[in-house]
C-alpha cells in the first residue's frame, strides 16, 4: 500500500526534531452542500530541525516514531512544485 503524502503549514517548531503541521481540507456537507474547511494537526519528524514556523511542507506517513509521531517531513512544498 502506498504511503499517504499530505501538504500543510508548519505551525510550531519548538520541540527538538519535531514540527507540528496543520493540514486543511475542504469537504462538502452531505445535506446542505456547503463547502466546509476542516483542519488537523500532525506531529512530524524533522531530523535536522530544518523547517520553521510558516513554511509549507509535504509530510509522509511512516512507522510510529513516538506516541504522537507517525509522519516525517519530506520537503518544502514550494521546492517540490518547482522541480
Swiss-Prot record:
GO terms for biological process: translation. This is Small ribosomal subunit protein uS17. The lineage of its organism: Bacteria, Pseudomonadati, Pseudomonadota, Alphaproteobacteria, Sphingomonadales. Keywords: Ribonucleoprotein, Ribosomal protein, RNA-binding, rRNA-binding. It comes from Zymomonas mobilis subsp. mobilis (strain ATCC 31821 / ZM4 / CP4). The keyword Transmembrane does not apply. Part of the 30S ribosomal subunit. CDD domains: Ribosomal_uS17. One of its GO terms (molecular function) is structural constituent of ribosome. Gene3D superfamilies: Nucleic acid-binding proteins. One of the primary rRNA binding proteins, it binds specifically to the 5'-end of 16S ribosomal RNA. Belongs to the universal ribosomal protein uS17 family. NCBIfam families: PRK05610.1, uS17_bact. HAMAP family: Ribosomal_uS17_B. The keyword Signal does not apply. Pfam families: Ribosomal_S17. GO terms for cellular component: cytosolic small ribosomal subunit. It comes from the Bacteria.
Amino acid at each position: 500500500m502506498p504511503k499517504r503524502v499530505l501538504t500543510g503549514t508548519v505551525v510550531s517548531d519548538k520541540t527538538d526534531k519535531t514540527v507540528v503541521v496543520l493540514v486543511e481540507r475542504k469537504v462538502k456537507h452531505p445535506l446542505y452542500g456547503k463547502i466546509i474547511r476542516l483542519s488537523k494537526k500532525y506531529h512530524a519528524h524533522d531530523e535536522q530541525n530544518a523547517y520553521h514556523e510558516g513554511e509549507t511542507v509535504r509530510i509522509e506517513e511512516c512507522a510510529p516514531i513516538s506516541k504522537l509521531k507517525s509522519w516525517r517531513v519530506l520537503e518544502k512544498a514550494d521546492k517540490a512544485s518547482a522541480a
